[in-house]
Amino acid sequence: MRGLVQRVIRAEVKSRAADSSEWSVAGAIGPGLCVFVGATHDDTVAQADKLASKIWGLRILDDSEGVMNRSLSDVHETGGPATVLIVSQFTLYGDTRKGRRPSWIDAARPEHAEPLVDRVVDQLRSLGATVTTGVFR
């Protein structure tokens, strides 16, 4: 599994129904982490658990002196909101080595990837994070 992590002041993801031209906010957060999560064919539940644990423990949030020294876990322990926006993203497994058209052959099929992304979300919630998600498509 791959996770692309970004610290954010605010983030939102929009989606639209197949039969509509209207976009709506599927998930939004204030300060926290926005994480794009992708899965490949042979990823397992154990890897999803490891990714969630890694996200929870990354010391990339500012402490009181403005130094990146705190994790979501630290924020949660001090009573702050440990907020995360998880966005499923098959393009993390895009291959652009040949030509100009990416290959998605390394990205897992939705029926394999969706439960793994859901597992990352569930694990983060069980650790104490407030998790918002996009729409899996």
Give the ranges of each region predicted by the language model.
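N-terminal, polar/charged subdomain of small-to-medium soluble alpha/beta proteins
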Residues: 1-99, 115-137
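A charged helix-plus-loop insertion that forms the helical arch/lid used to bind
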Residues: 98-109
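Conserved acidic
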Residues: 112
